[in-house]
Structures are given as structure tokens and as C-alpha cells.
Regions:
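"A position-specific structural signal for the A-helix of alpha-solenoid helical repeats
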Residues: 7, 111-122, 154-158, 194, ...
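Short, charged recognition helix plus adjacent turn
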Residues: 63-90, 261
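Amphipathic alpha-helical segments of tetratricopeptide repeats
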Residues: 97-101, 137-143, 176-183, 216-224, ...
């Protein structure tokens, strides 16, 4: 990743915007100049004010700064999906754990955490839990990053099975209170919506109805656009499960069956089968 200040200066100068214009009159030119030279940081609020003044979106800046260029997540998920089995994921997990112990690269530790989340999400019968060290590492990593890009959003979304419902809600509240949240929503809406949907499912499966209502409201406040038909359908299933668990079984069951029918019509076979299995298990437990 390139120096953020240097990238900012490159964009500002290429657009013939002066230091004074870039501050928008909200802070001093000297403060911005020191930031560009890497001598000090800007507060998040001032950084995003300056970003708006140089007419640059968060996604554009993230791309130019290389914030997402070194993401190992696509490679990791490819390894995971190549041979989806508990044994394969456990072996991958051990290999990344060993690599971290040997080289102390944070990417290896994060990869092992993501794999643990995958194992927990796909194989709930396995006795496995996130350690306090892993949860602390995730929190420190995510909330010490000044500019979130697709990598941070993907990391938070993928690791949802590791958290309790209350903790995931707490972290989501911190996310939506970030000063860059509106910019994140504009540039990475699908990733944000996946975070909300994962939180909704997590709260529902934990029977934490207050948390589920919190995520339900978030989803409705930032509802999926029509071109996000898959997420709309999964949300329909989640809403049905929420109602079913709260005792409104008839309408809840109807919504879940509707969602599965839509997935089947769209030929989303794996997803349809996944939610059919989930529905059977839910009915058998009740």
C-alpha cells in the first residue's frame, strides 16, 4: 500500500487544486501539507472533508492508494471452494497457522481466522470457537484502519460466525458510526448489505430478537436495490425465519418457502438446497 498522504497530494496536484482549496477552510494548510509529506495524520473527519474537496470518491482513492490490491481473500476463498470439505478446510487452517507461527505475517493469521469462521459456519457440529486473541486481533486490525476498503468490509463480513450476536452488533454499530460510513455505503453497498444480512442471520440463529430487530431496521434503512435480487431473496428467507422463531410460524414459513421457490426458479441450486436444509432443521427443532 502506498503512503496515503503522497497519493492524496498526487491527486490534488493533478487536478490543480491548491492546499488551501483542499482544506475547504476547515483546517490549516500546514496541517494538510505535513499529512502529504507523511509527517502527521489527519483525523478521519478532516481526511474525508479533504477528499470531498479534491472531488475523489473513497473507492477511487482506495484503488489509487493500493488499499485493496494485496488482498489475499480471493486466493483464500478459491482454495476453500476448490475442495469443500471439513478435512480440507482443517488442513488449510493448520497450514496458515503454521505459516503465521513461522513468519509472523498478519495475513496468515487473518487467513486462519477466516478459515475458522468458514468451518464454524458450514460445520456447526464441530467444537470450535474463536480465541480471545483472535477476536482482539480482528478488532484491533479493523478499527485501527483509517480508510476502509473492500478488504476490511469482506474481512468483517466473512468472520461473522466467530462473534456472538451482541459483539457483532457492537462492531456493526461502530461501523455505521464511522465518519466514512456514507462514503463506504456509496462505494461498497453490496459488501455493507452482506454485513447487515450476516448480522441478521447470526442474531436470528442465536434467538437474540432485539439484535435481530436492530439488523432488520438497518437493512430496511438501506434496502437492496432491484439489481440485488439475490440479496433481496436471502433477506426474504431471513425475515421468514425471524418471524417463525418469534412465534409467527404461518407467515414465517410462507416467506421462507417463497424465498426457496425464487432461488429454485433462478436456478440457484446450491443456495436453494442450502436453505431447504435449513428450513427442515428449523421445523424439526420446533
Amino acid at each position: 500500500m502506498k503512503e496515503i498522504g503522497a497519493v492524496f497530494r498526487q491527486i490534488r496536484e493533478s487536478r490543480h487544486i491548491s492546499l488551501e482549496e483542499a482544506t475547504g477552510g476547515e483546517f490549516s494548510r500546514s496541517m494538510l501539507s505535513r499529512f502529504e509529506r507523511g509527517e502527521n495524520d489527519l483525523t478521519t473527519q478532516r481526511f474525508f472533508q479533504a477528499l470531498q474537496q479534491i472531488k475523489t470518491s473513497l473507492s477511487e482513492f482506495s484503488h489509487l492508494a493500493g488499499i485493496d490490491q494485496h488482498s489475499f481473500i480471493p486466493k483464500l476463498l478459491k482454495e476453500h471452494y476448490e475442495n469443500m470439505s471439513l478435512e480440507h478446510d482443517q488442513a488449510l487452517y493448520q497450514s496458515y497457522q503454521q505459516a503465521y507461527q513461522k513468519y509472523q505475517k498478519k495475513e496468515d493469521f487473518l487467513a486462519s481466522i477466516i478459515l475458522k469462521a468458514k468451518i464454524l459456519g458450514l460445520y456447526p457440529e464441530v467444537e470450535l470457537a474463536a480465541s480471545q486473541e483472535e477476536l482482539d486481533f480482528l478488532y484491533d486490525y479493523l478499527f485501527s484502519v483509517m480508510v476502509w476498503g473492500n478488504f476490511e468490509l469482506s474481512l468483517f463480513s466473512l468472520t461473522s460466525p466467530l462473534f456472538s450476536s451482541q459483539l457483532y452488533r457492537q462492531y456493526t454499530e461502530e461501523l455505521v458510526q464511522r465518519e466514512d460510513f456514507k462514503l463506504l455505503l456509496d462505494s461498497s453497498r453490496p459488501a455493507i448489505n452482506s454485513i447487515f444480512l450476516n448480522g441478521f442471520f447470526l442474531a436470528i440463529s442465536s434467538n437474540e430478537f432485539e439484535d435481530a430487530s436492530f439488523f432488520d431496521h438497518l437493512i430496511n434503512d438501506h434496502f437492496y436495490s432491484e439489481n440485488e435480487a439475490y440479496l433481496r431473496t436471502v433477506y426474504l428467507y431471513a425475515k421468514g425465519e425471524f418471524l417463525y422463531r418469534k412465534g409467527e410460524k404461518e407467515i414465517g414459513l410462507e416467506k421462507m418457502e417463497q424465498a426457496i421457490q425464487v432461488l429454485s426458479i433462478l436456478d440457484c441450486k446450491d443456495s436453494a438446497n442450502y436453505y431447504k436444509q435449513g428450513l427442515r432443521e428449523l421445523i424439526n427443532k420446533s
